[in-house]
Structure formats: C-alpha cells, structure tokens
C-alpha cells in the first residue's frame, strides 16, 4: 500500500473521533495508517483490504490509536492474540490454496 484513500482515512478518523478537517493532521494520520498497514501486512505475510470490516482493519485502528498515544511499543504486546490469530488464518488459507493447486482444483 502506497497511499491512503479517502474512504479509509475517513473510517479511521471516525473511529478515533477526529471529526474536524486539518490537512496537516490528515497528512500525519495518513502516514501512521500507511505504516500500520505495512506492519500488519509484514507480520502476516500478505496484503489485506483495509476498507473491509475485518480483523485486519480492527488491528489497524488499534495501531493508529496506539501510535497517536505514543505507545506503539505496547501495541504488539497487547494485541498479540489477535495478531497471532490473523497470522494463523492466513497460513491456513495459503496452505489450502497450495493443496488445491496440487490437486488441480481452482
């Protein structure tokens, strides 16, 4: 992910109760969102669609809140169960895809 779209930015702003428009704050928030997306993608080994309401988006929202509070060191520790769950789900999906490919199933 290279750029935050307006929908995702709006969703995150709504979730963190930032209802006002401020270009400088939006730019900073967009950077935090991008870093969060990249970190979650790296941890799980795949790219998620953060516009969908899913566990990855929940983790992203929590990442943003922790980043804004200056507490990113605590984020991975406090959300380790959710992160591990998301990793396992992705590993199971990847395994199923590999097995389906071996059997010629699409």
Predicted features, each with a name:
Residues 10-11, 61, 88:
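Generic detector of low-complexity/intrinsically disordered segments
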Residues 49-53, 59-72:
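Mid-chain, well-packed structural core segment of small domains
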Residues 70-106:
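Protruding loop/beta-arch "assembly-hinge" segments enriched in small, turn-prone residues
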Residues 1-56, 92-106:
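Conserved short "hinge" loops at termini or chain/domain junctions
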């Amino acid at each position: 992910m290279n750029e935050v779209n307006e929908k995702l930015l709006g969703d995150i702003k709504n979730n963190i109760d930032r209802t006002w428009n401020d270009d400088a704050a939006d730019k900073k928030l967009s950077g935090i969102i991008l870093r969060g997306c990249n970190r979650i993608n790296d941890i799980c080994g795949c790219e998620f669609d953060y516009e969908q309401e899913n566990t990855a988006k929940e983790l992203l929202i929590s990442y943003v809140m922790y980043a804004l509070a200056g507490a990113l060191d605590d984020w991975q520790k406090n959300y380790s169960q959710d992160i591990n769950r998301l990793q396992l789900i992705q590993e199971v999906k990847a395994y199923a895809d590999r097995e389906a490919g071996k059997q010629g199933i699409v």
